[in-house]
């Protein structure tokens, strides 16, 4: 098994605490509402949202795969940090065991925030991660972030 780590950062004009509430804590409800072209539904299969919770994320028609199942590994409300692993569906299969993801939202001096994202692809055997998998994951994250950001800018009273 190999582990391939990819890190990225992206900025937002939304303050860290507000973005954490919307993007992380209520993303299950918000994503299908603000980005139905990316996520059609999120179903809580097991747990209460904390570590150990299993969620099924379903994608719309025409997507390369129908769903993924995520396991919540950590939710740190104080440091705006969220860790989860993709454990089933989507790219998980013959070549990938799981994908571990860490999202940390850091406040910036101008009142916005930086999302620091780390993706660890745990491969089976000597398989390598394809560049298009990493690109697709980054694009999905960016799509969701910008949709949530637009929603929050249009609804200044939400998630305060």
Swiss-Prot record:
Q: Which Pfam families match?
A: Bet_v_1
Q: Which domain of life is it from?
A: Eukaryota
User: Which Gene3D superfamilies did the record assign?
Assistant: 3.30.530.20
Per its UniProt record, what SUPFAM superfamilies does this chain match? Bet v1-like (SSF55961)
Mutating residue 48 to S: what's the consequence?
Answer: Slightly reduced interaction with BV16
The main location class comes to cytoplasm
State a single Gene Ontology molecular function.
Answer: signaling receptor activity
Provide the residue positions that the database annotates as binding brassinolide.
55, 82, 84, 101
Question: Sorted alphabetically, which InterPro entries does this protein's record hold?
Answer: Bet_v_I/MLP (IPR000916), Bet_v_I_allergen (IPR024949), Plant_def-hormone_signal (IPR050279), START-like_dom_sf (IPR023393)
**Changing residue 61 to S does what?**
Slightly reduced interaction with BV16
Q: Which GO terms describe its cellular component?
A: cytoplasm; nucleus
The yes or no answer to whether the keyword Transport is present is no
Q: Which GO terms describe its biological process?
A: abscisic acid-activated signaling pathway; defense response
Q: Which UniProt keywords apply?
A: Allergen, Cytoplasm, Pathogenesis-related protein, Plant defense
Q: Which residues form the signal peptide?
A: none
Q: Where in the cell is it found?
A: Cytoplasm
Question: Do you know which PANTHER family this protein is assigned to?
Answer: OS08G0374000 PROTEIN-RELATED, STRESS-INDUCED PROTEIN SAM22
* Biological role: May be a general steroid carrier protein.
Q: Which family does it belong to?
A: Belongs to the BetVI family.
Protein name according to UniProt: Major pollen allergen Bet v 1-A
Annotated source species: Betula pendula
């Amino acid at each position: 098994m190999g582990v391939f780590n990819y890190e990225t950062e992206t900025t937002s004009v939304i303050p860290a605490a507000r973005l954490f509430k919307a993007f992380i804590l209520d993303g299950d409800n918000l994503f299908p509402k603000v980005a139905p072209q990316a996520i059609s539904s999120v179903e809580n299969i097991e747990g209460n949202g904390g570590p150990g919770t299993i969620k099924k994320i379903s994608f719309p028609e025409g997507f390369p795969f129908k769903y993924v199942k995520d396991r919540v590994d950590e939710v740190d409300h104080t440091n705006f940090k969220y860790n989860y692993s993709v454990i089933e569906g989507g790219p998980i299969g013959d070549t990938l065991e799981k994908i571990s993801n860490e999202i940390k939202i850091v406040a910036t001096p101008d009142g916005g925030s930086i999302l620091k994202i780390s993706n660890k692809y745990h491969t089976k055997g000597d398989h390598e991660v394809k560049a298009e998998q990493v690109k697709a994951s980054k694009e999905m994250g960016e799509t969701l972030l910008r949709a949530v950001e637009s929603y929050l800018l249009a609804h200044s009273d939400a998630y305060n």
